[in-house]
Curated annotation (Swiss-Prot):
Its main location: cytoplasm. Regulates arginine biosynthesis genes. It comes from Edwardsiella ictaluri (strain 93-146). InterPro entries: Arg_repress, Arg_repress_C, Arg_repress_C_sf, Arg_repress_DNA-bd, WH-like_DNA-bd_sf, WH_DNA-bd_sf. This is Arginine repressor.
Length: 156
């Protein structure tokens, strides 16, 4: 039971630190957590936690690239304001390219990956503000393009 409480305390401290939007590296997060008494924390643990909670790097008010948590910690839905983060959707003969607001690509890609092959998505690769999406077997690029436009209520 003691271990669970320690883990919960770590998660609470981790989320609180990310809400400050001032940590630009995993090393800085490790150091801050160690200063809070989590002596056994290391960079690989912080990396796993960032992934687990869907943290993204984005610009803060001072225009510094920092880690932060998305507004929703669960799998995002298209009824949330996420569609406002999609700026442009285009395609060629092989892939669909989605341009997002800075820092939003990984969040949008996570949503698309959660839809999966049945919706025509084989997989995504996300950077900071760009996503490459490839269609699943049996789906044409144009079909995937139209489906993504409809999903984010973009105009043709």
């Amino acid at each position: 039971m003691r271990n669970t409480t320690k883990q919960e305390d770590l998660i609470k401290a981790f989320k609180a630190l990310l809400k400050e939007e001032k940590f630009s590296s995993q090393g800085e997060i490790v150091q801050a957590l160690q200063e809070l008494g989590f002596d056994s924390i290391n960079q690989s643990k912080v990396s796993r936690m960032l992934t687990k909670f869907g943290a993204v790097r984005t610009r803060n008010a001072k225009m510094e690239m920092v880690y932060c948590l998305p507004a929703e910690l669960g799998v995002p839905t298209t009824s949330s304001p996420l569609k406002n983060l999609v700026l442009d959707v285009d395609h060629n003969d092989a892939i669909v390219v989605i341009h997002t607001s800075p820092g939003a690509a990984q969040l949008i890609a996570r949503l698309l990956d959660s839809l999966g092959k049945s919706e025509g998505i084989l997989g995504t690769i996300a950077g900071d503000d760009t996503i490459f999406t490839t269609p699943a077997k049996g789906f044409a690029v144009e079909q995937l393009y139209a489906a993504i436009l409809a999903l984010f209520e973009q105009e043709l």
